[in-house]
């Protein structure tokens, strides 16, 4: 058996990126969270192509096609669920986000309230 990189190589790259991710601040984290629905949708779209090819061209048992369909449905559900992340992030961190977007006097002055400066 040869190959195996079709699914594995991109997943390994995603894992590498996740383990080396060092956001500069929480606004970046929020912005990155906002891209998760699209990323998961693209992943589901790729699975749909695989599912369609398996169904139309590959000599696999129909049960395999069914399993791929179930996997695709779960991926679609994950993309849908990820759409809840940004509104939740904004709601649950409203006070922090308001302060970042509307600092008192200036960003430099607001930084004096930074927890790390007051421990």
Question: Whereabouts are the PLM-identified features?
Answer:
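Eukaryotic extended alpha-helical scaffolding/oligomerization regions
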Residues: 2-119
């Amino acid at each position: 058996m040869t190959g195996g990189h079709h699914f594995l190589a991109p997943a390994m790259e995603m894992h590498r990126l996740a383990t080396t991710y060092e956001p500069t601040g929480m606004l970046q984290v929020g912005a990155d969270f906002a891209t998760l629905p699209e990323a998961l949708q693209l992943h589901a779209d790729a699975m749909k192509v695989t599912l369609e090819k398996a169904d139309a061209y590959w000599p696999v048992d129909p049960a395999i096609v069914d399993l791929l369909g179930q996997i695709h449905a779960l991926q679609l559900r994950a993309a849908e669920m990820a759409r809840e992340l940004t509104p939740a992030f904004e709601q649950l961190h409203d006070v922090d986000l308001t302060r970042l977007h509307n600092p008192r006097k200036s960003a430099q002055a607001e930084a004096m309230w930074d927890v790390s400066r007051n421990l």
